């Protein structure tokens, strides 16, 4: 049987995430799926995005999250 296209696998992953009902289910899912460093990086980027949306300045965000200026800039470009 041929392997599904990458896009189809991505859609399946996102649909699975949408079907999670509790924070505990989400934590378990992501801890099973991701390495600790990957989770930490995602959490840091989420924090950066939240602070950018609040209108915080780069230096404050870098001090608060310990993210690099490159990470803050990358997240800002994606918003």
Residue ranges and their predicted role:
Residues 22, 38, 54-57:
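Amphipathic alpha-helical protein-protein interaction surfaces
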Residues 4, 38-39:
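Short helix-capping and inter-helix turn/linker motifs at the boundaries of alpha-helical repeat units
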């Amino acid at each position: 049987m041929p392997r599904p296209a990458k896009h189809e696998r991505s859609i399946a992953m996102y649909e699975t995430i949408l079907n999670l009902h509790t924070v505990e289910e989400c934590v378990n899912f992501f801890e099973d799926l991701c390495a600790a460093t990957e989770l930490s990086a995602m959490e840091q980027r989420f924090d950066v995005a939240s602070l950018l949306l609040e209108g915080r300045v780069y230096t404050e965000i870098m001090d608060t999250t310990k993210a690099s200026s490159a990470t803050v800039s990358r997240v800002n470009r994606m918003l």
